[in-house]
A protein has these predicted regions:
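ATP-dependent small-molecule kinase phosphotransfer cores
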Residues: 1-58, 68, 77, 81-87, ...
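A glycine- and Lys/Arg-enriched "phosphate-lid" helix/loop adjacent to the NTP-binding pocket
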Residues: 7-9, 59-129
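Generic alpha-helical segment signature
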Residues: 17, 95-98, 153
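Residue-level "edge-of-site" marker
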Residues: 21, 65, 151
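Residue-level signature of catalytic and energy-coupling elements of molecular machines
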Residues: 24, 38, 72, 127, ...
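Residues at or immediately flanking beta-strands
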Residues: 36, 62, 88, 143-146
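Conserved beta-strand segments of the P-loop GTPase G domain that flank and frequently precede/overlap
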Residues: 40, 64-66, 148
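NTP-dependent small-molecule kinase module
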Residues: 108-166
């Protein structure tokens, strides 16, 4: 199934839901998933959620990290990466010692196309149209766990763990 997905991606096409669900279902059958699993980025649409239901894949919890569009734009728009070694930076939260220069290797810092404001806004538009409705879907099932965004990954992780009782 993975090769099938790769052929779509290599052609610049969206991978059909049936292939995505097949990959997820196949992976969740592995022994290391018997006691639980975490999915990130799946499902992205109501049809995917419904297909997972039909495949018998049940979620105990669905975490929704609540964050404003403006905060997402600021965070993603501020990301930079070294063009030579790939080291990550952020203009506000993790700036390099010298602007535009990687602390690790001296390479030039660039902004990935994915992090440019127009791209982020387009992705947010798609999110609001296709993914946001999942919150209502999982809320009706009683498994939605909304969590307020925190300033750091560590703080957000802590809040999620507390919300899940871990």
């Amino acid at each position: 199934m993975g090769l099938q997905a790769k052929s779509y991606m290599d052609a610049g096409k969206l991978v059909p839901d049936s292939v995505i669900i097949g990959i997820v279902a196949e992976r969740l059958e592995k022994p290391d998933c018997a006691k639980g699993f975490i999915l990130d980025g799946v499902p992205r649409t109501l049809p995917q959620a419904e297909a997972l239901d039909k495949a018998g894949i049940v979620f105990d919890h669905v975490v929704s990290i609540e964050i404003s569009d403006s905060e997402i734009e600021e965070r993603m728009g501020g990301r930079r990466v070294c063009s030579a070694c790939g080291a990550p930076f952020h203009v506000k939260s993790k700036p390099p010692k010298q602007e535009g220069v990687c602390d690790a290797c001296g390479g030039a810092l660039i902004q990935r196309d994915d992090d440019k404001v127009e791209t982020v806004r387009n992705r947010l538009k798609v999110y609001h149209q296709e993914t946001e409705p999942l919150k209502g879907y999982y809320e009706k099932k009683g498994v939605l766990v909304p969590v307020d965004n925190q300033p750091t990954i560590e703080a957000t992780t802590k809040v999620i763990m507390e919300a899940l009782g871990i």
